[in-house]
Amino acid sequence: MKIIQVADQNEGGKVAVEILRSKLAEGAKTLGLATGSSPLSFYKELIESDIDLSDLVSVNLDEYVGLEADDPQSYHYFMNENLFSHKPFKKSFLPNGKAEDAEEETEDYNRILSENPVDFQILGIGTNGHIGFNEPGTSFDSQTHLVDLTPSTIEANARFFETIDQVPTQAISMGIANIMAAKSIVLFAYGKGKAQAIAGTVAGPVTEELPASVLQGHEDVTIIADAEALSLLDN
């Protein structure tokens, strides 16, 4: 596990683009993408870079259940606004949050992931150590699944909605085993709110109670973080 301390999110985005550039030179074809505030600077730098995405495939970590793709709070909408409409991929896959049968959708998405193995996966991290929407207690063997969001995750995401009651209570998420199957992983963490989760991820016991701790067992993980997010780690 490699840790790169950056001054801020802007620098973090630049660093991640250069890591991606090196992976593309090694033949990477499929990118695993995330939503939320942490990867935004990466997408901005990627759009402004000379990297061509038109021959690449993307797969996203997750999507809320119950939101249409054109809902401004859906992750389809987020990705279109912040990356796809500026720099499209050859093909982009996201879970369908409006699928009639959510369990069937998880099976379909697992098939998509098996057909498009991820070479380079972007992650954020929740204050409770979740990656994707894999909440504490999620099995490390989990594949794409239907998730009941925890109160802390619903509260954290409420800032994107008019009221907390509008926040979806379920999501479809890649499982931890899906994430760990990626050849290379970059995780972003910014701010003191992420410090405890990062300390556990890097130096704590590997436990399903802190989902991101599983990354200790991956051979190619880079954490890009600011001083506040790294503040509980010993130098």
UniProtKB/Swiss-Prot annotation:
It catalyses: alpha-D-glucosamine 6-phosphate + H2O = beta-D-fructose 6-phosphate + NH4(+). The active site is at 62 (proton acceptor), 128 (for ring-opening step), 130 (proton acceptor), 135 (for ring-opening step). GO terms for biological process: carbohydrate metabolic process; glucosamine catabolic process; N-acetylglucosamine catabolic process; N-acetylneuraminate catabolic process. Coiled coil: none annotated. SUPFAM superfamilies: NagB/RpiA/CoA transferase-like. CDD domains: GlcN6P_deaminase (cd01399). GO terms for molecular function: glucosamine-6-phosphate deaminase activity; identical protein binding. Keywords: Carbohydrate metabolism, Hydrolase. Its EC number is 3.5.99.6. GO terms for cellular component: cytoplasm. Pathway: Amino-sugar metabolism; N-acetylneuraminate degradation; D-fructose 6-phosphate from N-acetylneuraminate: step 5/5. Pfam families: Glucosamine_iso (PF01182). Signal peptide: none annotated. Catalyzes the reversible isomerization-deamination of glucosamine 6-phosphate (GlcN6P) to form fructose 6-phosphate (Fru6P) and ammonium ion. Belongs to the glucosamine/galactosamine-6-phosphate isomerase family. NagB subfamily. This is Glucosamine-6-phosphate deaminase. It comes from Streptococcus gordonii (strain Challis / ATCC 35105 / BCRC 15272 / CH1 / DL1 / V288). The gene is nagB.
